Amino acid sequence: VITNIGFCHLENLKTRDGILKAKTESFAHLKPDGVVILNGDDDKLSTVEQVAGRKPVFYGIKGRNLCETSVCADAVTEHGLEGMTAEFHTPQGDMEVFIPIPGEHNVYNALAATCVAEQLGLSMDEIKCGIAAASTISGRTNLIHTKGMTVIDDCYNANPVSMKASLDVLSKAGGRKIAVLGDMGELGEDEKQLHYEVGTYA
């Protein structure tokens, strides 16, 4: 599973095309019955046509797809910091899914998990229940409720894509909002510009 080609590792790999090349090199180690699952809404991943003679399984949000997807979502409805609901369309059929973690990026994570689960033979009910039971880990959209405030702990290994996604989650919260942003590493020559863009986005 490759979720996106972002800006991590630019320091060593120079460009997003370099990152794509490095990530897809792992396909050479795929077993004969292996499956590659990719985000069909990513402008780089959507260009991957075949892996060892097989078409990858793509997922995405309806209307944004840059290629034909096997699993897609639409009717995405946000419920603040409580999560979101969406309609998932799969080869097995359609299902309404509750994702208990806020942020559109987590719709993509749930779509990727759905693709994996289908490859492993899980039923639609099992997939739906599994997604509804998902929880976060420390440093990844982890909600910490304290007296009079909620902290959104999303500090693990930040990059421009994850930082903007975290700011999107913050924007859905009620009340006064304060964003505490740290450095983003491994961004190479574009480091200053990418930090500036995140600051402007905030």
Functional labels for PLM-detected ranges:
Residues 27-28, 48-49, 76-78, 141-143, ...:
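Short secondary-structure boundary/capping segments
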Residues 17-21, 58-61, 132-136, 161:
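Short gly/ser/thr-rich secondary-structure transition/capping motifs
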Residues 1-10, 43-96, 137-138:
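Extended acidic/charged loop-beta regions that coordinate divalent cations
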Residues 3, 19, 37, 73, ...:
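Residue-level signal for inorganic ion chemistry
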Residues 35, 55, 176-177:
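Residues at the starts of beta-strands that form the adenosine-phosphate
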Residues 81, 91-202:
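Nucleotide phosphate-binding/pyrophosphate-handling subdomain across enzymes
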Residues 1-51, 186, 190:
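Flexible active-site lid/hinge loop adjacent to a nucleotide/diphosphate
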